[in-house]
């Protein structure tokens, strides 16, 4: 299998982080499988039982350095945490420990990447005080009478304006 330069950088960062974790915990962690088929707004996702990391190729291409320095250690920390501590909260103290004390990376639970290119369709909803963009999934739930959404300030039920934003 041939790797792109981006994928080489991911593998190199994984190797570096694994070596640090191996030394810190005095054990050998298996190298996870990495795939680039994650869709939507998530940057990455760790599959604990499979020892696999899925990365969002579109967001990766647009934010390569952030992925290498933040997303790859973040997802690997989930796998390491699971293998060392077992079943714990996804972003709990054990995960924070691996991020900050082992990998020396700030323990952020969400990314701040620009997601316009992967966002999908959004629809405008409003109440008396403001407007909200709702995803196509939430919009469809409203249309099918499966859900309603309320304003965070005035608690009024949001109503579709008829406008598709993107």
From Swiss-Prot:
Record's keyword annotation contains Metal-binding: yes
Binding positions (Zn(2+)): 74, 78
Cofactor: Zn(2+)
PROSITE patterns documented for this protein: ZINC_PROTEASE
Pfam assignment, any one: Zn_ribbon_SprT
Active-site positions on this chain: 75
Gene Ontology terms: biological process: response to stress
Domain spans labelled SprT-like: 21-160
Subcellular location: Cytoplasm
CC per GO annotation: cytoplasm
GO terms of molecular function: zinc ion binding
Keywords: Cytoplasm, Metal-binding, Zinc
Details of cofactor binding: Binds 1 zinc ion.
InterPro entries per UniProt: SprT-like_domain (IPR006640), SprT_Zn_ribbon (IPR035240), Uncharacterised_SprT (IPR023483)
Protein family according to the UniProt entry: Belongs to the SprT family.
Name of the molecule in the record: Protein SprT
Species name: Vibrio atlanticus (strain LGP32)
Gene this chain is encoded by: sprT
